């Protein structure tokens, strides 16, 4: 899962949206630096990442990547799941329009920015102002996201080419998304994530 899915599942679970978004920027035990609700959100994010990586649908999808891009498949797939969530938001969350949800999420996350790592603050500067969460529905933007990550982290250069794997297996990936994401939503609503 990437930003949008983590925020969405956190909302369904009444968890800290701030903690769920911040988690990738926090190493080790967060309890000494953040309030309990944010810490719980960080741990929820970590549980979701571990669970998602082990879902049969996700393990199967990783095998569709070419040898040269398979190493970065988990990262690429996380971005792709956000694409499908953004694209199908009106079906997935008909009572909470995407624009309204994004405004709500932004307001929640903004409360922790003064005490956040600089890299997280920098991400937030772009995430909201450049409307990444809305733009995830556009495959050209997904390609830009993957290229941007490859540019920032040269050891992940294969992300650039992984877009072709997404394109080649688009329909099958979308089908897998519909297999597992509604289950995760139900688990979040039951606070079982």
UniProtKB/Swiss-Prot annotation:
It catalyses: holo-[ACP] + H2O = apo-[ACP] + (R)-4'-phosphopantetheine + H(+). Keywords: Fatty acid biosynthesis, Fatty acid metabolism, Hydrolase, Lipid biosynthesis, Lipid metabolism. Its EC number is 3.1.4.14. The keyword Hydrolase applies. The keyword Ligase does not apply. Belongs to the AcpH family. HAMAP family: AcpH. This is Acyl carrier protein phosphodiesterase. It comes from Salmonella arizonae (strain ATCC BAA-731 / CDC346-86 / RSK2980). The gene is acpH.
């Amino acid at each position: 899962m990437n930003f949008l899915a983590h925020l969405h599942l956190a909302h369904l679970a009444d968890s800290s949206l701030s903690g769920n978004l911040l988690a990738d920027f926090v190493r080790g035990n967060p309890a000494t630096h953040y309030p309990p609700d944010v810490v719980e959100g960080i741990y929820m994010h970590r549980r979701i990442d571990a669970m998602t990586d082990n879902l049969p649908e996700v393990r199967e999808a990783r095998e569709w990547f070419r040898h040269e891009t398979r190493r970065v498949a988990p990262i690429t797939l996380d971005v792709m799941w956000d694409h499908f969530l953004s694209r199908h938001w009106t079906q997935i969350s008909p009572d909470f329009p995407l624009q309204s949800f994004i405004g709500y999420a932004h307001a929640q996350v903004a409360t922790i920015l003064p005490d956040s790592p600089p890299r997280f603050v920098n991400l937030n500067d772009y995430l909201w102002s450049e409307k990444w969460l809305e733009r995830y529905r556009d495959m050209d933007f997904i390609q830009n996201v993957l290229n941007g990550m490859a540019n920032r982290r040269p050891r992940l250069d294969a992300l650039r080419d992984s877009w072709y794997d997404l394109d080649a297996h688009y329909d099958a990936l979308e089908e897998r998304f519909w297999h597992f994401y509604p289950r995760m939503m139900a688990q979040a609503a039951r606070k079982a994530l």
